[in-house]
Amino acid sequence: MNRNAAILGLGRRGEAWARLCLDAGWSVRAFDPAPNAASAVARLPGLKREDTISSAVRHANWIICSVPDRLELIQMVVQRAQAEAPQQAVVAVASPVFDIEAIQGCAIRPGQVLRLCETPGGGVALDVTERNAPDLKSLAQKLTMELAALRSLGDDPTTQDDGADAESA
C-alpha cells in the first residue's frame, strides 16, 4: 500500500502528526490557510504544503484532520476532504473533544471516518463505531500502532495543548 497522508491543519497537533508520518516514510501533503503554517513546513523537510484541501487530499489514502476543535469546522473539513479524496481514503479526526458519532454523522462516507485519541504514556487509540468495517478497523489499527511506536521514541507535542491549533484555521 502506498502511504500518502494529507494533514489538514498545521497547528501543534497537525505538525506533530505530519512529523510522525514523515518519520514513518510516508509522502505527506498538508493544507492550512493560516500564514503561520509556513513555519511548520520549514521545520519539516519533505512536507509539501498545498493551497487547497482538494490538492492536499487528491492522492491521500490517510487523511488526518487536526483543525481547531469546533464541530462545525471539523464537519465541513471532513465533508470537503471526502468529496475530493479517493473513495478508499480514511479520514482520522484528531480531536479530544467531539464524539465520533457526531463527526461521522456529517460524513459522505461515515464508515471511513474515525477518531484518533491520544492516551497517557504516548499511545494512540482509535475511536470507531459499528459503521467502520472490520478491515478498515484492522488497517487503521496497524497504521496507528506504527505511528504510536514512533511517538514513544521521543518528545511528542501531540499530547501538549497550548491553544496553537485554535490559531491555525
What is the role of each PLM region?
Residues M1-K48, Q112-V113, G121, E146:
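NAD(P)+-binding Rossmann beta1-loop-alpha1 motif at the extreme N-terminus of oxidoreductases
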Residues N4, R12-R13, W17-C21, R29, ...:
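P-loop/Walker A phosphate-binding loop and immediately adjacent motor/lid segment at beta-alpha junctions
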Residues L8, F31, E50, S66, ...:
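Structural motif
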Residues R12, N36, E72, F98, ...:
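Short alpha-helical
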Residues P33, L44-V90:
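Rossmann-like NAD(P)-binding element
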Residues A38-V41, A81, I103-Q104:
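Hydrophobic packing residues within well-ordered alpha-helices of enzyme cores
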Residues V90-D156:
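Rossmann-fold dinucleotide-binding core
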Residues G163-A169:
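Interdomain hinge/lid region at the active-site interface
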